[in-house]
Amino acid sequence: DAGRTGEWAEFLDALAGHPELAARIIMLPGNHDVNVVDRANPARLDLPFSPGKRLRQMRTLSAIAAVQGDRVRVIDGSGKPSATLNQALEPYQDRITQFAQHGGVRRAMAVRGLFDDQFPMVLPPDQDGGLGIAILNSNAETHFSFTNALGLVSEAQTRRLEAAIRHLPTSCWIIALHHHLMEYPMPVKTFAERIGTALINGSWFVRRLQKFSDRSVVMHGHRHIDWIGTCGASKIVSAPSPVMGAADDAVTYFYIHRMVVGPDRKLRLAEPERVEIAGS
């Protein structure tokens, strides 16, 4: 749970046994993938020029490409979803491989910016007016584990998101990111739950989403809390984790969500289907 090579290998090996499921999975980066410096020592620093952060980014990007590299597309300079992720990464494969095998500050600099430039990735609608998925990186640039949970959606990434949505003006969208946009209007057990976990610029990002909120739904994880609601006109779905904080013998659950487009071309959430998982 810290973006390590063995963890990614175990995940990909498990997924390889379920090709039909793998073909439907969409991955996005979370803070444990890229921002946990040392699980055993939360105060350990990862200096801005250290190759450690860049290495975790390349592992994450490589895993994402292994799962969906031929299905998702990156945004070109005109705002159009163009090359697939695998095509976009092809010119950098040697640099990524050399860095992964040998490390070093110079090799880290050779892939600087590559991770951020791929977001948002877009799974385009399969037909005009269909449903697409915009996949965002919401992880802030942090350098030690105490601040690993901070979230931020950059202005550059937001502009690319807006351009992609404008390029497909009749389509509807799931906007998928790891961090929650704002604090939920509900009591919490500890004050610490309200510190440094939502997007730093969440209010700003929500305002930017309002212009296409009638044809989008925001989905996120991070806090693993069961919550569905709105902020302004934006519809927001928080995904409860069926494993985080659950005892092995406890009954857990997840939701299957269905969406419909009304005659007014607005995207609506239908009542979700709750799927319960029996304890072991």
Give the location of each predicted region.
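A short C-terminal boundary segment appended to hydrolase-like catalytic domains
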Residues: 259-280
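Conserved beta-sheet core of the metallophosphoesterase superfamily
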Residues: 88, 185, 190-263
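Active-site-proximal segments of metal-dependent phosphoesterases and phosphodiesterases across multiple
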Residues: 140-159, 166-216
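Active-site glycine-centered loops adjacent to acidic/histidine catalytic or metal-binding residues
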Residues: 30-31, 178, 221-222
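Short catalytic/ligand-binding loop motif for oxyanion handling, primarily in non-cytosolic enzymes
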Residues: 1-4, 34-38, 142-144, 182-186, ...
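Beta-strand-turn-beta hairpins that frame and shape the catalytic cleft
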Residues: 117-135, 171-172, 230-236, 265-268
